[in-house]
Amino acid sequence: MGKNLFVKGYEDDTKEIIQNLISLTEEGVVDYNASVEDWLIENPNVIDSDEKRAILLRMFENSSLAMIYGAAGTGKSTLIKHISQFWQDGSKVYIANTHPAVENLRRRVKDNSGEYLTIKKFIYSYPPDKTVDILFIDECSMVSNRDMIEVLRKKNFKLLVLVGDIYQIESIQFGNWFNLARY
């Protein structure tokens, strides 16, 4: 019976995460597409890829959740940087599971106005009454279900960007949510 309850807990956690993520897809940013188009006209050389321009144009049009999947070297960090550049006047927090991952994110994104934290620091130390415009979570395949639930329960972000590679090292604790969220 104990094992069944343990597995049932994993199932319940996964369902809660997926339901929270689905709820974030119900509404996008008003006039988002027009804002991005204007920004791209004003900054024609910022994004060097038509594919990334197209992604940025649609990213938050109908959803407050964006999910970026890709193997190493596919441009995930570059896309995070472009999103950050578009939201340059907004408040941004970048989180990852480990200190080296956070430092790597800081080095690649180069957003001096953003905050960079480990997931644990965000969960346990970030002020619950402080809402950020956009929360980035990098290396999502390494984020446990339990930690993801805690991040989602804080509900202190307007937009959420989840980034990762499902073939990367998995979470040490149980963490299947990022792979399942693709579907």
What are the residue ranges of the model-derived segments?
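Conserved ATP-binding/catalytic motifs of P-loop helicase motor domains
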Residues: 1-183
